[in-house]
Regions:
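Hydrophobic alpha-helical segments that drive targeting, anchoring, or assembly
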Residues: 69-70
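Short, surface-exposed, polar/charged, turn-prone segments marking secondary-structure boundaries
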Residues: 46-47, 78-79, 88-91
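Alpha-helical support elements that line or immediately flank enzyme active sites
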Residues: 73-85
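C-terminal binding/interaction regions
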Residues: 1-26, 84-126
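Structured beta-strand/loop patches that form or line metal/cofactor-binding pockets in enzymes
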Residues: 18-64
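A short glycine/serine-rich beta->alpha loop
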Residues: 35, 59-66, 115-125
Length: 126
């Protein structure tokens, strides 16, 4: 029963709401860069396209095939990525990895919404 309660906490109302409201879904016609990643643990797949101007992301699109946690993460990223530099995005990525893998603090603004994923650190396959 305790494990079930923990799983319910993991898939909180906030995570489910973020997953349901994912912005920038689709693809761009002429992106400056594209990337696709697949998780070997769970099979989630994320493909992104970006257009950059003057060193900042001006357009962003994503196709996400993932569980609610992956969709919530994609939602937080997409809500905050326009206007950011590649360095800001890389810093948020590194801070998120540290939070999930070694108990570090959540990423700083504007990506502080990733804090909602902190409970996932207890579930290595997530």
């Amino acid at each position: 029963m305790t494990e079930q309660i923990e799983l319910i906490k993991l898939y909180s109302t906030r995570i489910l709401a973020l997953a349901a409201q994912m912005p920038h879904v689709g693809s761009l016609d002429n992106p400056d860069a594209s990337a696709m990643k697949r998780s070997p643990l769970c099979g989630s797949k994320v493909a992104v396209d970006v257009i950059m101007q003057n060193g900042k992301i001006t357009e962003f699109a994503q196709n996400v095939k993932a569980c609610a946690l992956g969709q919530a993460a994609a939602s937080v990223a997409a809500q905050n990525i326009i206007g950011r530099t590649a360095q800001e995005v890389a810093r948020a990525r590194d801070e998120l990895a540290a939070m999930l893998k070694s108990g570090g603090p959540p990423p700083g603004p504007p990506f502080d919404g990733f804090e909602v994923l902190a409970p996932a650190s207890e579930y290595k396959n997530r």
